Swiss-Prot record:
The gene is rsmA. It comes from Rhizobium johnstonii (strain DSM 114642 / LMG 32736 / 3841) (Rhizobium leguminosarum bv. viciae). This is Ribosomal RNA small subunit methyltransferase A. Specifically dimethylates two adjacent adenosines (A1518 and A1519) in the loop of a conserved hairpin near the 3'-end of 16S rRNA in the 30S particle. May play a critical role in biogenesis of 30S subunits. It is found in: Cytoplasm. Keywords: Cytoplasm, Methyltransferase, RNA-binding, rRNA processing, S-adenosyl-L-methionine, Transferase.
Length: 275
């Protein structure tokens, strides 16, 4: 990457700015610049896109996104220690990197989004990644403001995102992702690619919005998935009792003796629409 963008190696940047990944912030710095380029390429053509990045840290992925030609990167960083390193990247790419100090969970991404294609590419902090994904999946208006999500998670979370019915990993997250997006696991990232190395393998997931998901009220789908998977080993007549139980299931044409993990996304939407 140094030969590609003329900036110093990331290890030098981290040492010079006294940066260390903090567990409390869910940080694991990705220092393998071949991998950061691979992640950025997974998002497809970037030349006309504005890219949101969450938790850029010392900027390894940020540099890859900019080097591959993104029109602009808007990076949300909570850790003020990382801001000087990111400022150096901004100086190297005048007018193309905007760094916003703040909490991504409290950030209104849609309001910040300029006109044109929007992509979100991020090595998400482990402690907020799933909630951020759910936030991006559940706006009332659809299609969303973003064109694609290219996100790194712990592999176990990635498996939940892409899971279908009758899969051990299938749950509320799989239903929400399958309802509104087409999701795939692109590739795994080993622990040794990070500083410090996490205890688990990570994976990069690519999500693109479905143009016409099954019509369904977001709030109702959240209710039925939360109730059904909250007691996933019980029959639906029992787990959905607070929402109407057997009466609701009969109305939706679903056998009350089935369990949550056997229902397809379409069937969960039938339940939500029967509330």
């Amino acid at each position: 990457m140094a030969a590609l963008d003329g900036l110093p190696p990331l290890r030098d940047v981290i040492q010079r700015h006294g940066l260390d990944a903090r567990k409390a912030l869910g940080q694991n710095f990705l220092l393998d610049l071949n991998l950061t380029q691979k992640i950025a390429r997974t998002a497809g053509a970037l030349e006309d896109a504005t890219v949101f990045e969450v938790g850029p840290g010392p900027g390894g992925l940020t540099r890859a996104i900019l080097a591959l030609g993104a029109r602009k990167v808007i990076a949300i960083e909570r850790d003020t220690r990382c801001l000087p390193a990111l400022a150096e990247i901004a100086d190297h790419y005048p007018g193309r990197l905007e760094v916003i100090e703040g909490d991504a969970l409290k950030t209104d991404f849609e309001t910040l989004a300029p006109q044109g294609p929007i992509k979100i590419i991020a090595n998400l902090p482990y402690n907020v990644g799933t909630q951020l994904l759910v936030n991006w999946l559940l706006p009332k208006a659809w299609p969303p403001f973003w064109q694609s999500l290219t996100l790194m998670f712990q592999k176990e979370v990635g498996e939940r995102i892409v899971a279908n019915e009758d899969d051990d990993h299938y749950g509320r997250l799989g239903v929400l992702c399958g309802w509104r997006t087409e999701a795939r696991m692109a590739f795994d990232v080993p622990p040794q690619a990070f500083t410090p190395p996490p205890k688990v393998t990570s994976t990069v997931v690519q999500l693109t919005p479905r143009e016409n998901p099954i019509p369904c009220a977001v709030s109702n789908l959240e209710k039925v998935t939360q109730a059904a998977f909250g007691q996933r080993r019980k029959m639906l007549r029992q787990s959905l009792k607070p929402l109407g139980g057997e009466r609701l299931l009969v109305k939706a044409g679903i056998d009350p003796a089935r369990r949550a993990e056997t229902l397809s996304v379409k069937e969960f939407c039938l339940l939500a629409n029967s509330l």
